[in-house]
């Protein structure tokens, strides 16, 4: 969930200075500093499950997996975000002059919240597509069994796939990992 903190336009340097001294995380989008609010139990559980699935599947392979607390810089938009889950090939590439901001994800996953789902699907995805290394995007619904996947096939061409049955297999071609939708939603309870 994202809640707005300020309406003043900031410079990226001001944002980065705030983040160094802040106990809370913020995203930096179009000059705005936006507080990242706490998520629901389903959001946390799904993020944790995906993180675990990827870590186990990629053990011994040249990837690092990050969940929720690793900042990503989107250079073309000069945005800073904290994706729910990222797969990053090693060696990790960091923003010049920084030791805490990644620039080369191949896979990004976002667990959708009611307040951010349109933003995650539209503006955020458009920004992520500008990252040269970015190959695959997962949008995971926390309110019903549904995973949407965008896979890059070549420059400016993406294939969309949707999964809504527990037995459906999601194939992440960018990192050669496959898992069932049912595994991702294990022990998740949907409220009416």
Description of each model-found segment:
Residues 1-192:
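Gly/Pro/Ser/Thr-rich low-complexity, intrinsically disordered segments predominantly at protein N-termini
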